[in-house]
């Protein structure tokens, strides 16, 4: 008798559910995708015990026809695909027909639905099978209640993280869905406490204000761009709002949130020297394209995709982000001590603290990304974000919105300054929208003005510890890192100086020796002609070694061997020779070594000359490594610090 047997349907469904339903957040994601595909304009999510006890998703979409109810919990039953060719033209978020079957295999599911002009129906399912179906009163749309998740798979239940972690996962999913569908009103309630509430205005920056706070929202820069294949639109935050991990990078393709290492890299490259190593931006980017150019049928979670013409899209993202910051004023303001303000908010609203970067309540990271670079440090020490409790006994929307806006403003330091840019009394959604619109007007004015000098005029006051220059003008005080300032000046000088291609080489009396493994040698040999074209002639020397007898004259003598090593490593990683990138790295290296260091005292006229040179730079706000050069203190901030203004 043979050993191979066909699995029972219930067991096969549980195995398949392991890929689709990893945690409570997976259930929320699948149900939200179904609601959005049903053209819902309002979606309410209610969870108990972080989704372990129950998850309820109510939408006002098209609903499910009575004749379709008998198939709704069958695996691979869907209304979104009909033939093979449809798989290459997917515009819906769901398409596999696995979600409800997988959920009902590991939970108890009650589904109530009603289509336009028809009577409502209710069905109840366990273990993937419908146990009851009956008529029921229902509004147009679908109401799904998922209870006792993993009740029949205790091994899965024990791998569920803490309630705060799971709540964080759910909040993250809703946040991203709200960003990609700003025209939909989302409400997330956890144990009767409202955590997220969007107004469905259709403005992505308003949703981002709810998630990240008004301070970040005011510093969002709109980007847009087109090629023959792609339409790109999004918002990128100024570099001063950078974070310690990639979690705050949100990329969407045709409204679908995805994870893609190459596109993440393009975004970071777009910021270029505006970010320090290990810092990543807050941004939202949506790319519209013909579905035939993207394969979303890679993994059941639908987070991974394969892209056609990926390099073209990479270049578009880099270009548009660089253009966005080209003429912006990027001097960061000093933040006042946030501890006092946080404590004040806690006293007033008695909130439950959920750490923003520890993946608890608001905008937490996905814990199981497929690229290691997307993982979030559990112990990240960046700023916290407080979720909102209703502040009145009747839980009215007005009270909630007022409390929410006050919390967001206090936590993000969004208080009134001398220019009147911040209004601590603007606690309604309407006021927030007006502030965002005003900020966008300022951006448009700046773009039209395009000033040549982006650093304002300032007078030197003195120097601190031979490291920082103190300067002032009528608006306030400035601190300048003298090493970073001269590093930027020399970087742009060397970058331009070595920017012209030359075939002149420096011959060596004693050749340089380089060692590479066999697999690396195969790649080097493949690209040897390209290396020769840029003046790097690698000659085999033994079984694993190469020698170099000359190098281009623009290589700094002291760093020539290091530059050649970096050049070859770049080829090994990227499978191409990028002379522009190599020359830039050389310029960074030279500028750092030749700039004045800390504890070097300067005369006043030397400091003034340094500032004047900095004002002429193309990008005067960060050194080539991304560290800030200038920090400003407005007159208002100084008066607040000394309690002259309360």
From Swiss-Prot:
Q: Does the keyword ATP-binding apply?
A: no
Membrane-spanning residues where? none
Which domain of life does this protein belong to? Bacteria
What function does this protein fulfil? This protein is involved in the repair of mismatches in DNA. It is required for dam-dependent methyl-directed DNA mismatch repair. May act as a 'molecular matchmaker', a protein that promotes the formation of a stable complex between two or more DNA-binding proteins in an ATP-dependent manner without itself being part of a final effector complex.
Protein family (similarity comment): Belongs to the DNA mismatch repair MutL/HexB family.
Q: Which organism is it from?
A: Staphylococcus carnosus (strain TM300)
Q: Where is the composition biased (Low complexity)?
A: 424-436
Residue ranges, annotated region (Disordered): 356-380, 415-452
Q: Which GO terms describe its cellular component?
A: mismatch repair complex
Q: Name one GO molecular function term.
A: ATP binding
- Any keyword DNA damage? yes
User: Coiled-coil region(s) at which residues?
Assistant: none
Q: What is this protein called?
A: DNA mismatch repair protein MutL
Q: Which PANTHER family match?
A: DNA MISMATCH REPAIR PROTEIN MLH, PMS, MUTL, DNA MISMATCH REPAIR PROTEIN MLH1
GO biological-process terms attached to the record: mismatch repair
Under SMART domains, the record lists: DNA_mis_repair, MutL_C
SUPFAM superfamilies from the UniProt entry: ATPase domain of HSP90 chaperone/DNA topoisomerase II/histidine kinase, DNA mismatch repair protein MutL, Ribosomal protein S5 domain 2-like
